[in-house]
Amino acid sequence: MGFNGGILEGEEXKAVVTINXP
């Protein structure tokens, strides 16, 4: 869990910040 509107909040957030997005 950590996907919030395309924002991955957590440790990988720094690596992935646009999942729901293009």
Swiss-Prot record:
Q: What are the BP-aspect GO terms?
A: butyrate metabolic process
* Keyword set, alphabetical order: Fatty acid metabolism, Lipid metabolism, Lyase
Question: Reaction catalysed by this chain?
Answer: a short-chain (3S)-3-hydroxyacyl-CoA = a short-chain (2E)-enoyl-CoA + H2O
Please name the top-level EC class of this enzyme. lyase
GO MF terms listed in the record are: lyase activity
EC no. given is: 4.2.1.150
Known pathway = Lipid metabolism; butanoate metabolism
Q: What else is known?
A: On the 2D-gel the determined pI of this unknown protein is 5.2, its MW is 30.9 kDa.
Q: Which family does it belong to?
A: Belongs to the enoyl-CoA hydratase/isomerase family.
Q: Please give the name of this protein.
A: Short-chain-enoyl-CoA hydratase
Species of origin reads Clostridium pasteurianum
Q: Which gene encodes it?
A: crt
